[in-house]
Amino acid sequence: VAGSSAAKVSPTTVVLGQTATVPDPSCPGMPCQAIGSVTGFQVNNGQTSLPFVVPHDGRIKAWTLTLAQPTNSQRAFFNGFFGTPPQARLAILRRVAGANPPRYTLRRQGEVQILSPYLGQTVRFGANLKVEKGDIVGLTVPTWAPAFAQDLNTNNVWRASREPEACKNATDIRQGEPQERVGSRMPYGCKYTTARLLYTATLVEGR
C-alpha cells in the first residue's frame, strides 16, 4: 500500500481589518452618523496600515459588520436621506496605476445583504469571492449602513468613492454613487480621518 508521510497543511486564514478591540458605532448617540451611497475602504484602522490589502491569492469566505441600533427617528432620517432598507455588499478593488486622485477598478462584488434584521449586532455573512495579492476588499453601501465609528484617533482613516470636491457637502454625499458596475473605474478622492468603517473580511489562502 502506497502512502504519503507528508502531513496536510491547512490553508492560511487571515481576517482582514480585525483589531484587538472594536470601537462602538456612533448611533444611537449624538451625533448619529452612518455611511451611505458610497464604496469605501479603511486605509488605517488605528493599529494597521492598509488593513484590507490582500496579502496573498485566495478567496474571501466570510465578512462581518458591526452595526449600531439607531432610534426610530434616526432610522427614518437615514431612510429619507439615502433610501431604504439599509444594505451593504463587499467590493473587490484594484488601484489604477498612476491615477491621481486615486482611481480603483471594481473587479468583483458580493451579494447585497439587507441589514434591517441585524441592527445592534455584529453580523457575519458568508462569501466566496476570488481575490489576488494586492487587491483591496472594500465595502459598498447602496443605501445606508450604521457600521461607522467616529471621533477616533487621527490614525483612523478611510477612503471613499467620491470626487475630491464632493467630500463634505450634504447634497454631494446624498447624490454620491457607490461603485457597483464590475469593470468600472471610479475616483476615490475623499479621505476621512478620525473615523472607521466597522467591517472585516476573512481570507482563505488558495484558489
Go through each PLM region and give its residues.
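Short consensus segments that form the blades of beta-propeller domains
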Residues: 74-84
